[in-house]
Amino acid sequence: DAQSKKPFTYLLVDEFQDCNSVQYEIIKMLYTTGGNVFAVGDDDQAIYGFRGADPGIMQRFRKEYVNADQVVLGRNYRCVPEIVDVSAKVIACNRQRVSKQLTSGREAGGSVLLKGFPGGAEERSYILEQCQGKTPLELERFAVLFRTNSSMGVFEAQLMQAGIPFVTREKITSVYGHFVTRDVMDYFRAAYGCRERQLFLRIWNRPRLRVGRESLDSPVVDFGRIRRFYSEAPYENPAAVRDVEQFERKLEQLGRFSLELGITFIRRGFGYEDYLRRKAGSNRELLENWLEILDWLEEDCRGHENFEKWERCQEQAARQLSQEGTGGNTQKKGIHILTMHAAKGLEYDRVFLMDVNEGTIPYHKAV
């Protein structure tokens, strides 16, 4: 309306790097000749690209408002020189940014250690070792940062199993309730004699069998009955019969394996890993998270005499996590596990960055 289009004398824009194109157009509509725009931002701290924020607008602003003065605040008062120097080298690889010289306003006194691992299991084990023997008050100054909270579940379970106190600021999906964990446990339950219809409806097509729900018309699954169902008209299907026979044989094999070998057999013998690859599609990070849970299950089952004891231990751990609650529990003392997004503006004496692998950090779709 006429009132909103009336020129503003002054306009202050904060967190300019998080501005999207629509917001920028509104700014230009509000600002007319004779006004003063004061925009504050740091394109190196842009974290809202998922909702349309475009830090490139800061460069557009400089081109469209050629008379604007630019003041670069290049001194960092939060981090020691060692961290600022290493960070600046990494950030400088981004060519689509406002060039700036970064320095530290603090005395030297820190270090950055780059440590490589064969895989995620070894990486997590290293951090657990660094936490052993520390008091909750000492761990309060530690933080482990992940790119997304979907990657935290396995580490959360390992911290709890190791008796290491931890604090979460976000809701973490429990690894014990994850569909991958449920599927693996269901395969074992079926191998050890469970014939509940609902269980088989969950695993029947993971991987896909040429068997339909119509053959599971009883609360208790009977393989002989299913074979007969597909051996006679009108549902005669020799391929389905072969699938059922093969599935039954694999369950018998699974029941004879140790737990650890059994998980490997589920992954490859049943083709569950291939099923996860198809389900994840092009989402590489999602697949890696799922495969990490399978790796963790192989670790977690070790030391348990049989499936019944392992299942009971998992149920107890799941209850403990549920009782402690996840997300927003900031009163207890312990190591902090959180996403990089949630860590913005916070300070810790020792920080572990997880999964610093090409394609994960930064995410391959973000570059």
Per-segment meaning from a language model:
Residues 1-59, 75, 79, 337, ...:
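Conserved helicase NTPase motor core
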Residues 12, 36, 54-57, 76-82, ...:
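Helical mechanochemical/support elements of P-loop NTPase systems and associated helical scaffolds
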Residues 33-36, 42-44, 65-70, 108-112, ...:
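Short glycine-/polar-rich loops that comprise or flank the Walker A/P-loop
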Residues 43-47, 52-56, 76-80, 121, ...:
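Conserved nucleotide-binding/hydrolysis micro-motifs of P-loop NTPases
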Residues 64, 108-110, 135-259:
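ATPase/helicase motor core of nucleic-acid motors
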Residues 66-69, 74-165, 191-193, 255-256:
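Helicase P-loop NTPase motor core
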Residues 182-186, 336-364:
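A short beta-strand element within the Helicase C-terminal
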Residues 232-342, 363-365:
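Accessory C-terminal helicase-associated subdomains
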